């Protein structure tokens, strides 16, 4: 009997962990300009970015989304000249790369796959 309970607990723990957790697809870090490795995502997904630097008024970061197969410019994801962090939600699946351009800055970009339920929790500022 205790063996069945143990197996049930293990199974429920596994199901709960896989059903509710976002999945890290890729993470990129740097302090200069680069085009990232190719990554594949399903809808929905987010770009989670962070920017830091030593020169408050001289730093900058621009991130552009590129379709990996064609090299087509999908759009600018971010342009900032200030320290900070944020997320951008996407509803399109695909094979992508990021083109990152930075000036006097250290940046981190994480690509996270979400469930539909997790995506519903993301709302834009001021959209109450």
Predicted feature locations:
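Sec-dependent N-terminal signal peptides
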Residues: 5-14
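Acidic, Ser/Thr/Pro
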Residues: 20-128
